[in-house]
Structure formats: C-alpha cells, structure tokens
Amino acid sequence: FNRLCMVHDLSAVTAALMMVRRDVFEQVNGLDEEFSVAFNDVDFCLRIREAGYLIVFNPDAEAWHYESKSRGIEDTVEKQERFRGETERFLARWTKDYVDPYYNVNLTLKGQDFSLRV
C-alpha cells in the first residue's frame, strides 16, 4: 500500500526512534514503568492520542536499531514471565473498547502480513 513511503498518522510508533515535545511527555506522565520493556511505547503513544495529539510516521527519519542488543532476547523464564505480565496489563488497559482508526478494516488481524480479511 506504499505507506512506508509517505508521512502518515498511526496509533503508535516504536520508542527506538521517537521524538515528542517535553510538555506533551509531561502532560501524559511519560512512559509507564509498569511496562519496563514491552508495550511502553505503544501505551505512551495511545495516551498521547487520548490527550488529543497525533502520532506521525515520517519515512525520512532514519536510524540503525539493533533490537534487543542491550537487554538480550527473551530467553529466560524470568524474562518470559515479565513479558507475559506486561502483555496482560497492556491488554487489560487497552483492548476493551480500542479500535485502531489507522488500520484498514479490510485487512486481517490474524497475522502480520497485511493480508486481506476473508
């Protein structure tokens, strides 16, 4: 759909390459420490949207990000339990009434390949 080539609004972006004004950061109380690793950026973006601001993706912004380089992979029982807990907290907070206004309703939610819903 060529979306990666265009500036457009999204519900959330990765914190690995995010810019936000300080006053907005403070208005929504920053990143929630309940999400120490997973979902902290998504939760933050959703709270920014609730406050009336847009989350904008800009394809001209570039950076190298080595996923999990500093914290390692989720390969221990402790890390997997933390991830499971953060997932449960995120879903409890956001999935009850949330519908992503930027996700095409004609696409499936069952995968990550943007295939058509059938």
Regions found by a protein language model. Give the residues of each.
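C-terminal, non-catalytic tails of nucleotide-sugar-dependent glycosyltransferases
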Residues: 1-10, 14, 19, 55, ...
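A short, conserved alpha-helix in the catalytic core of glycosyltransferases
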Residues: 2-29, 34-64
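Short acidic (Asp/Glu) and glycine-rich catalytic loops that position anionic groups and cofactors
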Residues: 64-70
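Residues at the C-termini of beta-strands that transition into short coil/loop
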Residues: 59, 67, 94
